[in-house]
Amino acid sequence: GDYFGIIRDRLRNAKGKIRKKCADYLIYVLIDAIVDSYYDILDHYANELEAIENDIFIQKNKNHLSRIHHVNKDLIYLRRSIAPLNEVIFRLMKEEIVLIQPESKIFLRDVLDHVNQVVNQIDVDREYLSDLVQTNMANMNSHLNSIIKVLTLISTIFIPLTFIVGVYGMNFDNFPEIHSQN
């Protein structure tokens, strides 16, 4: 979506503090809008993780690793995209930049906290994905074990029968029971 649309409207209509404050406040508002967009994206992935978890427990014999891998790849991409923002905000706060007022550094500190929250949530989601991989593998192993039980049962029945057929199906004349009358 257009995350800067609200900011453009405020600038055009002279609403809010944006027109009254300096350019450093505009930087804060723009960065804050970027960070807020990550919350929407993380909400989407939280729903996706919940759906994957439900599917893992409903469809126990299906392999969900491709979906998990896809979400993990997206979360890695998200983390890599927000990491530079952390450094930019930190430099804006710490370095002596004349255009950044001390009051705006307080706002930037707030945005930096939000960036750290987003990074932490991404890390939590990736750990959750690891748990989902383990759960998926446990379900697949359980399904495989049940198949092996059935195959073991079948082989237990047919191995003795195969042995008897093999012994009595041999073509030789000196077998003790071949010439008996019973």
Regions found by a protein language model. Give the residues of each.
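Hydrophobic alpha-helical transmembrane segments and their immediately adjacent juxtamembrane loops
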Residues: 113-182
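Peripheral, non-transmembrane regulatory/ligand-interaction domains of membrane transport proteins
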Residues: 1-103, 107-110, 114-121
